[in-house]
Amino acid sequence: MENNKTSLVTLPGAIIIAGTIIAVAIIFVNRPVQNNNLIDNTKSTNETKQINLSPVTAEDHILGNPNAPIKIVEYSDPSCGYCKIFNSTMTEIMDQYGPTGKVAWVYRHFPLDKPDQSGYVLHPNAGNESRALFCISTLGGNHKFWEYQKQFYVMTPSVTSQTPQGLDQKQIPILAKEIGINTVSLAECMNSQEAKDKVSADYLSGINAGVSGTPASFVLFDKTIDPTTISYISNALVQYRIPEDLLFVSADQRVISMSGAMPKALVVGLIESLLK
């Protein structure tokens, strides 16, 4: 990594976009290995800006006002280190904007537990961890889901070179029990077809929306996004040295796509520009 320069470091199944002070990173699905060269992301097409995002419904995991003018839909992998970073950012965002009812956080499952062409699995425990999250919601309701989700992302080491296995899976029922979830019922639910179907449905909805890695977020606004916000995004691309395909407005100007662990200051600025 070099200072004063945006670098792109590619690994099997992973990509890291880094700047001088803040890292914006995303773990990708089945990403081919590339040379460590900068990639020209200055060109974009209307096709790449079409976002087919599934509507937010009562079936989603929603924190905050379900009728909030701004909804941030995040596709997340529990084993993803950059999801852990962005989870902390979103927790702070909701502490700031949740009480006002102006921002809601929608969590969707996107476990990177599928083998690539060589058979390599990036996060082998992510599916199990995603099913646990779903089952906490099923057994304890939305409040327990968010209580568990917050504690899980705080305690998990996530998958890194130092902790390649991530969280010890034996910790899942222990954490669930601490928040009042019956562990026998949890185990039964996690092995159920319903849990598998829900996680798969979220994953497929992410694929349809153009998600190729985690964390991937979509900012939904209840109005057409105006030139002020579009100008803010253009400036943010330069300020944070972010490739255009990681932060852009949809063709219908109703959705903003954010790929990676975007810094809190950027997200706050985006929210403020929308609320003006």
Question: Model-predicted segments: where are they?
Answer:
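C-terminal cap of thioredoxin/glutaredoxin-like
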Residues: E2-N30, Y75, K170-K276
